[in-house]
Amino acid sequence: VLCANDKPEDVFAPRQAGSLLTRQKQTYCAGEGPASEFAMDAQDLSANPLPERESMEFDVVIVGAGPAGLSAAIRLKQVNPDLTVVVLEKGAEVGAHILSGAVVDPSGIDALLPGWREEEGHPFKTEVTDDQFLLLGPAGSIRLPNFAMPPLMNNHGNYIVSLGNVCRWLAEKAEALGVEIYPGFAAAEVLYNDQGAVIGVATGDMGIEKNGEPGPAYTRGMELLGKYTLIGEGVRGSLAKQLIAKFDLAKDREPQKYGIGIKELWQVKPENHRQGLVQHSFGWPLGMKTGGGSFLYHLEDNTVAVGFVVHLNYKNPYLYPFEEFQRFKTHPAIRGTFEGGKRLSYGARAITEGGYQSVPKLSFPGGALIGCSAGFVNVPRIKGSHNAVISGMLAADKLAAAIAAGRASDEPVEIENEWRQTAIGTDLRRVRNVKPLWSKLGTGLGVALGGLDMWTNQLFGFSFFGTLKHGKTDAQSLEPAAQHKKIDYPKPDGVLTFDRLSSVFLSNTNHEEDQPVHLKVKDMDLQKRSELEVYAGPSTRYCPAGVYEWVEKNGEEVFVINAQNCVHCKTCDIKDPNQNIVWVPPQGGEGPVYQNM
């Protein structure tokens, strides 16, 4: 173990092993955090030089097999079948890390694959038949009339889907066109040429042991080089985060805002199922000061997706998003759906919520950001996959034209210059004030004024508010524990409500135990002085997978990282009040393996 002060400490962290929770020893440096924090690249620790990476060359390298990345790949081959295109996916399979509601606006798929409705085997099996909006109180609910909702909130013509299955279907389309897709390979490093332009990415090394040294099964990562590189990692992607910082892509933009979305998939009794029903709600249990909402989506085969979103600009460090979700299911208007049912799956993922004014500059030398890496979610609609598809198509069209003109590794500024004139710009511009109004004025007045603002944008094409600012980051929004009261949450009953560890088991999450911890604490002393002593350890609550614990050892509080439980939601990277936790990819193919999510 490499420790700057030669004082390693051992702490023990539970890991998931089949259906058992065993305990794995992790070694930390006293007062400094995980030893692996000082070894972001194994080459820094190894006494022996690592072998050179092998490389492969393509016209376009795409990071992330989500809706944006796969749509970009398909579009590139549609425009020019001779282009060589590769897609890297860190999940064990395409769709393994995809988590969404999801009610999909098909406009993006219509543009990409116009004849998809005539095909057999497409994943759009359940069209929305009923659209409901509920305001929940502690004991009752009020259904808001549909005629009062802005037209853009209407879900008729949309489809309830598993977005993971949509991505699997898109991957088949891409491969049929000649796209190479490599699941199980995490893009761990951006590669640059001598002029500082992006020329591709390198996959992570495999077989690095937890001390940072190459083990017996060590395999060097691969370089994938391209004339252009598209980053479609999803929300808070590790490479996108680096590129935004390196090229100052967030300059003159509002800070990005986020939510944490937690979802379960249930098999319910036939009498409790209404295929095509979409039900959105807000209010209880979050109250009127904390932003968020919830959904029930009735899919095919008597399955129901239930989800809960908490805006991550909440102030109270004692708030526990997972427990708020469990409480939500006990509401009289909600619990009946699940009586006699069985929970099938569980997962969680951060959501971009900053909208129009938080979208970073998309282009950089050698490539561009697409999809949720750029933040194209329409917050009030709770939809972003249609914009992800369109962004992938836009980027593909511009890169295909650039390559045809003999260009390579320059900045495709046309992507940045034109996205606001596409359907994405229209979609985000008209809802740009909903999130800041909600954040500043609360669920009651904020939501009402946000609805009014959507109506004025719909009818007159303008907003009385102009373009509002978000202000603080989500990390800065958290207040010291002394300013708040603890929240008592009921114990789970194991039938309708559950604990985190039994929930994580249903995500099929797995990580090799003998590897460096992929959740890096930059300063362990700061974590104790501030995160614990000032904020009462919010990481133990905001994480939906129980990754973080403060445990007493030898009379001292020690920060324990149960990295094996991580579902890759990225909440810690976003909400830690000191930005002291950094999420980096573990070995490729690890993390959750979501099915039908």
Where are these regions (language model features)?
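Extreme N-terminal leader/targeting segments of oxidoreductases
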Residues: 23-60, 75-84, 527-529, 533, ...
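Glycine-rich Rossmann-fold phosphate-binding loop(s) that bind the pyrophosphate
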Residues: 65-66, 163
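N-terminal Rossmann-fold NAD(P) dinucleotide-binding loop
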Residues: 69
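N-terminal FAD cofactor-binding segment of flavoenzymes
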Residues: 90-140
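Predominantly flavin-linked oxidoreductase catalytic cores and closely associated redox partners
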Residues: 164, 168, 173-336, 375, ...
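FAD-binding beta-loop-beta segment adjacent to the flavin cofactor pocket
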Residues: 348-379, 503-514, 527-542, 549
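Active-site-proximal substrate-binding core of FAD-dependent oxidoreductases
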Residues: 375-381, 393, 397-442, 560-562, ...
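Iron-sulfur cluster-binding cysteine motifs and their immediate structural context
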Residues: 533-563, 571-594
